[in-house]
Design a protein with these regions (language model features):
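Catalytic and substrate-binding clefts that recognize carbohydrates or anionic sugar/phosphate headgroups
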Residues: 1-154, 164-166
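Structural preference for beta-strand elements that scaffold enzyme active sites
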Residues: 156-160
Length: 169
């Protein structure tokens, strides 16, 4: 594969994202013996990224590095209970990284003009889910939940009072 390799991902005849030379990587950690795989998808100028589950950070994820692992960090940390390796783009598509391992994302930062994601393992499976119609973000989210499963509606009693020790009043 040469330096001119390009993969264009299109929907309705229009390019929504893509991958170029050096968009796929393999990294071996000599200290731990672990292998990590990474992929990068292009971002257009002005394209915003949303999602990645529960975060105590700005809603727009551009410029953020997000490491996904479960942890009890409270509200003063970036650790969260509900990590979801799925993001939506303002261009009307979503990306789901299908990995049971800890997944790291770097979203359009000073170092990356793309969304880069990586995980430990010998393979890295991800889905680019194009939205369609009048509301492509809603459609992409619906297609994502069709792929991964939709939750049942919790019982009415579960919507009651919620107490926390993280805040004082």
């Amino acid at each position: 594969i040469g330096r001119n390799m390009q993969i264009a991902i299109a929907s309705g005849g229009e390019r929504i994202t893509g991958m170029g030379f050096r968009s796929l990587g393999v990294m071996d950690d000599e200290n731990t013996g672990k292998r990590y795989l990474s992929a990068q998808l292009d971002l257009d100028v002005g394209e915003c990224i949303y999602g990645l589950g529960e975060r105590f950070t700005p809603f727009v994820k551009n410029g953020q590095s997000v490491d996904m692992w479960q942890g009890d960090g409270g509200s003063c940390s970036e650790l969260a209970y509900k990590n979801v390796p799925f993001y939506l783009s303002s261009k009307g598509y979503g990306v789901f990284v299908d990995s049971p391992a800890d997944v790291s994302f770097e979203v359009g930062s000073e170092n990356v003009e793309r969304v880069r994601f990586s995980a430990e393992g010998e393979s890295l499976r991800f889905y680019v889910i194009a939205g369609a119609g009048a509301n492509p973000l809603k459609d992409a989210l619906s297609r994502y939940t069709h792929l991964t499963g939709r939750p049942a509606l919790p019982p009415a009693w579960s919507f009651g009072l919620w107490l926390t020790t993280s805040f004082t009043t």
